[in-house]
Amino acid sequence: MAEFKFTDLVEPVAVDKKTALRITVLGGGSFGTAMANLAARNGCDTMIWIRDAETAEEINKTHINKRYLPDFTLESSLRAVSDLEQAVCDRDIILVAIPSHSFRDVLKQIAPYITAQAVVSLTKGVEAKTFSFMSDIIREELPEVPYGVLSGPNLAKEI
């Protein structure tokens, strides 16, 4: 079976570093990877933050997230990083695709680096200890930051 590439469906838009929207996706799971790839394909200057430096390096070399989306070749303009400060600073939008059990902790870690960025939660579910929605956690941990939520029945391989 031939390898499937996103570009077989849609021709990617070239990234213009001067005018491109600067997006970071926090979380290298299947949904975070799919959303980061979609942003890159649509001409955004896109980074994906992955906790593991070796995995980030492998994605940058192979353009494949072998653990979560092994059958998809990612856009060459998508950059994976493992440094949270680098991932968040000087970005326009931060998409958070972190599991709900780690969501609050990651927001606390990025709080010192957030200035005018908008934060959008892609995370499903509620926080187990508090039963808080992810939007409530954003409001608590980043009270001055504009935020949004993307939700619905989405499968990463369909995006």
Predicted segments, located by residue:
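Rossmann-like NAD(P)(H) cofactor-binding subdomain of soluble oxidoreductases
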Residues: 74, 81-89, 93-159
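NAD(P)+-binding Rossmann beta1-loop-alpha1 motif at the extreme N-terminus of oxidoreductases
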Residues: 2-72, 81-82
